[in-house]
Amino acid sequence: MKVISCLMAFCIFSLSVVAQDAGALRKKHFNLENGLAIKGYDPVAYFVQNKGVKGKKELAISHQGILYYFSSETNKEAFKAAPFKYEPEYGGWCAYAMGQNGEKVTIDPETFKILNGRLYLFYNRYFTNTLKDWNKNEATLKKNADINWPKLFK
């Protein structure tokens, strides 16, 4: 009985360490400002309002080490029920840059695209809107970004 109890305790401890490591890895590679994702924009609003909407600090939750703000309690609850449905692709970095050369480039949270139920964010400053470039070669850039993003975790 002691052996089983020890094995169970070890398994629980191991899972806890793995979860902590995953959270630390996400924090290292996600596009965060002071631990905050999407520059404080509500990830659910992109899907339900089809626009970027600033979230509120009082409606914040943390998911696997990443802090998200929400514009409404309804959006917060939707995220809690299915966080991976609403999290941005490529850790919230510019999808175009990830596909073009595998680089982490900041984004304009109001420049986005929903594609196959996933949120893609883009750089849009100084006369450069990378969403336009993405749209010209979306299939290739998405394929490349899907290959490049996991490489950053190695």
Predicted regions and their residues:
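Intrinsically disordered, low-complexity terminal tails and linkers in eukaryotic proteins, enriched
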Residues: Q20-A60, Q64, K85-K154
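Mature extracytoplasmic domains of secretory-pathway proteins
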Residues: Y69-S71, N75-P88
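Bacterial Sec-dependent N-terminal signal peptides
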Residues: M1-A22
